[in-house]
Amino acid sequence: MRRGWLLFLFLLLAVACGRDDVILHGETTMADIRDGVLVTDNGLTYHIAEDRTSSEWKSWQRTFVTCDILRQRSDKAFDIRLTEAHSVLRKEPVPEGAVPDETLGDDPVQITAGWVSGGYLNLMLRVVYRPEDEPHLINLVRLPDEDGTVRFRLRHNSHGDYYGAPGVEPPLSFGLSYVSFPVPADLPAADGLAGVPVEIRYRWHLTDGNGNLLPETEEKSLTGRIPR
């Protein structure tokens, strides 16, 4: 019996010694980068205690990260283990007519997700790309408001690197990217607690019956509300 208790105690000690002392695993968040510290969209401050990425995140303005929360420093400050970091393009929306059409482009781009946080309109985008080509340009053009709805058009200049362009044929390579646009300060009055209606128009490919992309494109839109 004593031997059994000793074995049980040994197992408890082994589990305790091997336990990863982490408050939360796999936290994901958008954050601004300020002097090597992450300031998340919900107002928390993350200090990087361990960096397990090979990214150059310190040179970025904004990032989408996956991390483990290790320790709490204060009410809203934590030490974290950084496990994954993606660069997020931070860019101001441009007024309609402020940038020439040939610079903006109108090539296909897909909005796969969109949400508002941290004072930003955040978009996850998908484009067809070839790694050897020059970087694509993304802009969010502010259109005139219509019936209380804030209207935008997402513009994409691929410099000829899109499906349907000469030399761009299947199999295709796709790139996912994150872009954050500061929410404009001159929004119309909100409709009660529901927020301000918003519409983002963009152009993306048609698909066949099996879900495969076709070279032809169509107008699409993402709608939602911006909290006030």
Task: Tell where the protein language model's regions lie, with residue ranges.
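Beta-strand/loop nucleic-acid-binding surfaces
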Residues: 43-56
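Short helix-loop boundary/capping segments
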Residues: 111-169
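C-terminal motif of bacterial Sec signal peptides marking the signal peptidase cleavage site
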Residues: 13-16
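Short beta-strand elements
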Residues: 208-228
